[in-house]
């Protein structure tokens, strides 16, 4: 990303959305120690912040200031950048990061954007998708394919630190009787191509 302020905003947004959607906060105390959400009082306090953020009653910066926290943006590593095909009525411009999950924090989905969760290795998540047990779009699929090459979090982080991240603009391609999201060169994820369902008119 060419503009520093835009780049920093993407990193901050990644940390904020992880907290808002699953309750995982990548942040440090002023002394450099990681924030913990371990005790009953800590869970109650940070759950309250999270509810206020999701309701629009508080800004993320206000929570950080109140708790005197700093964001270790250097612990998020830029991994991939995806843009939806131009013909689609709903488009996204999304960036994926890799990071080690903070210790002493329990993942709790927000019940709105995320209604359930489970921990899976990347290869296991792809297998669940291929069996039709979970849904994914192409950016999720291909990012998991890429990240499944690594045996550990440390390997993924090291690779991301050295990585050049181009923007990938996907396409819609007609395959059989389905519209499928494919890579820019037209190749599809053959094991189970992600079918795009157009919104119904009227």
Task: Set out the residue ranges of the language-model regions.
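The catalytic Nudix box helix
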Residues: 1-72, 97
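Short, well-ordered beta-to-alpha junction loops that form the rim of enzyme active sites
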Residues: 30-31, 81, 140
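Short catalytic/ligand-binding loop motif for oxyanion handling, primarily in non-cytosolic enzymes
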Residues: 34-35, 88, 106-107
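Internal, well-folded beta-alpha domain core
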Residues: 43-44, 57, 117-153, 157-162
């Amino acid at each position: 990303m060419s503009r520093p302020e835009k780049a920093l905003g993407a990193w901050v947004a990644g940390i904020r959305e992880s907290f808002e959607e699953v309750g995982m906060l990548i942040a440090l105390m002023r002394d450099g120690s990681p924030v913990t959400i371990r005790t009953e009082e800590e869970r109650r306090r940070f759950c309250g912040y999270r509810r206020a953020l999701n309701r629009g009653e508080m800004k993320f910066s206000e929570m950080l200031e109140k708790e005197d926290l700093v964001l270790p943006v250097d612990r998020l590593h830029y991994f991939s950048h995806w843009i939806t095909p131009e013909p689609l009525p709903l488009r996204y411009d999304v960036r994926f990061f890799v990071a080690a999950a903070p210790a002493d924090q329990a993942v709790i989905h927000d019940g709105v954007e995320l209604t359930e969760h489970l921990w899976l290795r990347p290869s296991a998540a792809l297998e669940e998708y291929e069996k039709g047990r979970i849904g994914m779009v192409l950016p999720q699929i291909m990012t998991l394919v890429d990240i499944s090459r690594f045996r550990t979090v440390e390997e993924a982080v090291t690779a991301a630190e050295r990585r050049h991240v181009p923007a990938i603009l996907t396409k819609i391609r007609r395959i059989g009787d389905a519209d499928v999201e494919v890579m820019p060169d037209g190749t599809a994820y053959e094991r189970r191509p992600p079918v795009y369902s157009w919104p119904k008119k009227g």
